[in-house]
Amino acid sequence: MIRREIVFPVPREELWEALTEPERLEDWFANEVEVDLRPGGAASFRWSNGEERHATVITVAPEEQLTFAWDDEGEVEFTLSDDVDGTRLVVVETVPAWTTALDLQASALTYVHG
């Protein structure tokens, strides 16, 4: 399990959009994104290097929590909460390989710091 907390200097609504809207996800996570944002919905992420990952949406609580189950094992859970400096994002990933969590961390830091 990998757990990471990051505080973003943006309102919760804006961070939620960055995590759930395909166009916003394409700004910082993957090159092509499709998400059916409802429990049981499908999600797919494609990168320019040819890598592709698929997931199923497990939980959706707008502006609070989003959980995906990766089709190749593991889950990733995003939990948002208010923070004096903006919005706190807690990412918990349970997956045999650490690559997704580490990629997410690097992308998130780039997104915040431009």
Residue positions per predicted region:
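Tryptophan-centric aromatic hotspots in well-structured domains and transmembrane helices
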Residues: 16-19, 28-29, 70, 97-102
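Generic macromolecular interface patches on structured domains
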Residues: 25, 35, 67, 108-111
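Hydrophobic-ligand binding "helix-grip"
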Residues: 34-39, 44-96
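A conserved amphipathic terminal alpha-helix motif
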Residues: 94-114
